[in-house]
Amino acid sequence: MSTLRILVFGIILSLTTQISAKEMIYEKLDQLFYDQVEKLQSGNLEERIQAADYLKFVSSKLAVRPLLKALKGNVNVPKSEENSPTLKFTIAQALGAMESDIAGPGMVEEFKKISANVQEGDYPAFSSPEGYNLVIAAGELIRNVGLLPYTKENQEAILNALNHPNFYVRASAADGLKNLNRKDTLSQLNSAIDKEKNSFAKVAILNAIVYINRIANQKFYDLCAFLKDESPMVRYRASIAVGEVDLKAGEYSLREALLVEHDKMVREQIKKDLASVTGFKMPANTILFTD
């Protein structure tokens, strides 16, 4: 066999080996994917939640239909683990991350179903032995509808949620409109802020308005003013909002807030958002920023 033939044979063998190795990797990934889908459909609650979380990070649109099926839960057994708000929360995030247009109708339908059971006085439970409550799940659904490709139906569903009796659902609807990022929703957002009484929801609505406009106008300074609110939860949310819109004008308000903020969780969030606005990581040992 000539040297040239040996060289060609070696190249072909090398390429074949590489292709074979890649095929094996793809097969393993496919098997892992289907294992997670199986757990999503028939595992215990913890396995279902972990599977939905895994599928969120894989972000494969192959998972959209299995996730939508799991989102519906078990309509015949209301207290079934399949209807867990924590599971619905995680599935909503996964579907939002996949940004598939076919997810919209199912997510909107499920939001309408569960939000009908959320009352005006219900409070979002971020941590409890049972996990998240229905308020959190409803909010996460409508928030993530805003991440999907635009449709008139999706936008109308989010706008309608802006009038929900519960403040957290209204705030989540504002987040959904922020995610949708369409200037034609500004009139409804401006109308909503004029009649909103709840400070947390006000911050979310202002956040959406400023995010869409990207202008340091009066609405932006109204948002910054909530960094002085009596409620730590509102101050925390306001800090996230100011950091998220990423306008340099927010630096002064965040620095002023940090000088007087005593709540540890809020302080840490302000530090993160200030670093985001100023474009660098603040030293942990700087006297001004120590607890």
Residue ranges, per PLM feature:
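Bacterial N-terminal signal peptides that target proteins for export
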Residues: M1-L7
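Hydrophobic alpha-helical transmembrane segments of integral membrane proteins
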Residues: T3, N44-L45
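Bacterial N-terminal signal peptides
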Residues: L7-L15
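Sec/Tat signal peptide C-region and signal peptidase I cleavage site
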Residues: T17-A21
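Structural detector for internal amphipathic alpha-helices that build alpha-solenoid repeat scaffolds
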Residues: K22-K28, E46-S60, K79-D101, D122-Y150, ...
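Amphipathic alpha-helical scaffolding segments comprising HEAT/armadillo-like alpha-solenoid repeats
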Residues: Y26-E38, S60-V77, S100-Y123, L148-A161, ...
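Short inter-helical turns and helix N-cap capping residues of alpha-solenoid HEAT/ARM repeat scaffolds
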Residues: G43-N44, V75, S84, S115, ...
